[in-house]
């Protein structure tokens, strides 16, 4: 009887030992799946594996890197991973990447980049100071990741220091994200449920209202057929790290309003909590002759003083100058 009990105990211990060993082996296998490695050969850096790119995996200021290929399975690009890699001119990002870290490609030589539509988070300054960067394809509904405890005052993904001409969105647009993107043209996805792009400017889906003007524009000609000038299209703000507001379209010098515009709205499509920052363009040309005094005052007080239309001079002589 004692012999049978002893054998039973030994069997139980053996089973537990095997179970622990198998469990441990399984855990090691899972850990192996999340391992991300890299190789650098003849200027091409290849990153592969399963899971997040390690935070310690940084190539900052590496002059040997000319091309980066991130393989499918990698789920993130780490903080400042390739910042100031002055010779980096080509980047491939797979659909598995969900997060692009803060200043990941800051100050590189890339001329174009495509961020997958499945990417959910993009870090502050990810494409900042990329002086050769002309085109970006990226999600419109991304979440901006900000650096904690920073003195950097500008919240952006692509800044004025970058040479970005066109940003094309491959998902529906979250309107406040426009505040973080400096470009000459903004192109929304064809299947965006709320907006469309006309000549690089964002309008409502039916084209009746203007919604956002790109930050680098110096002149705006509202398209004929638009019936509502939403002033937030040019008055929208960004917020710095200290909570101060600044106007995004400060480069705008001239606005041309066509005869199709029938109304002016100062608050529609407002995405920030603070009041809009007033700005002053050099010239506002108005074709419509039936604006009321309140609309004209809103234009003159928020956007500028030079409004070229003779028949309206008598309405608001202090705000209107005829040229």
Indicate where each model-derived feature is located.
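Bacterial N-terminal signal peptides
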Residues: 11-21
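Short amphipathic alpha-helix with an adjacent loop that forms part of the alpha/beta core around
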Residues: 56-61
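Boundary/junction segments of secreted and surface-exposed precursor proteins
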Residues: 36-40
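A structural signal for leucine-rich repeat
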Residues: 149-151, 159, 180-181, 268-273, ...
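Sec-dependent signal peptide cleavage junction
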Residues: 19-35
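Structural signature of tandem-repeat unit edges
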Residues: 41-51, 63-76, 86-99, 108-121, ...
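Bacterial N-terminal signal peptides that target proteins for export
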Residues: 1-12
């Amino acid at each position: 009887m004692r012999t049978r009990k002893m054998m039973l105990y030994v069997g139980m211990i053996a089973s537990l030992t095997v179970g622990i060993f198998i469990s441990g082996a399984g855990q090691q296998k899972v850990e192996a799946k999340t391992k991300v490695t890299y190789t650098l050969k003849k200027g091409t850096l290849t990153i592969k594996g399963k899971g997040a790119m390690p935070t310690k995996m940084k190539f900052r200021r590496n002059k040997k890197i000319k091309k980066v290929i991130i393989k499918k399975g990698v789920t993130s690009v780490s903080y400042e991973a390739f910042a100031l890699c002055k010779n980096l001119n080509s980047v491939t990002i797979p659909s598995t990447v969900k997060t692009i870290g803060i200043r990941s490609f800051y100050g590189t030589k890339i001329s174009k980049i495509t961020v997958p539509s499945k990417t959910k988070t993009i870090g502050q300054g990810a494409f900042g100071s990329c002086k050769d960067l002309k085109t970006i394809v990226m999600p419109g509904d991304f979440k901006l990741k900000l650096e904690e405890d920073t003195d950097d005052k500008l919240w952006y993904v692509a800044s004025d220091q970058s040479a970005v001409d066109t940003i094309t969105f491959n998902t529906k647009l979250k309107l406040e994200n426009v505040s973080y993107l400096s470009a000459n043209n903004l192109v929304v996805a064809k299947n965006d449920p709320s907006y469309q792009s006309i000549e690089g400017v964002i309008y409502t889906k039916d084209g009746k209202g203007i919604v956002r003007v790109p930050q680098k524009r110096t002149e705006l000609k509202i398209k004929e057929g638009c019936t509502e000038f939403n002033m937030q299209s040019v008055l929208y703000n960004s917020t710095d790290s200290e909570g101060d507001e600044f106007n995004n379209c400060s480069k705008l010098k001239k606005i041309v309003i066509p005869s199709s515009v029938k109304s002016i709205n100062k608050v529609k499509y407002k995405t920030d909590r603070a009041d809009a920052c007033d700005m002053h363009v050099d010239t506002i040309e108005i074709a419509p002759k039936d604006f009321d005094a309140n609309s004209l005052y809103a234009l003159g007080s928020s956007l500028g003083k030079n409004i070229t239309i003779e028949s309206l001079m008598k309405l608001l002589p202090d705000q209107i100058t005829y040229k």
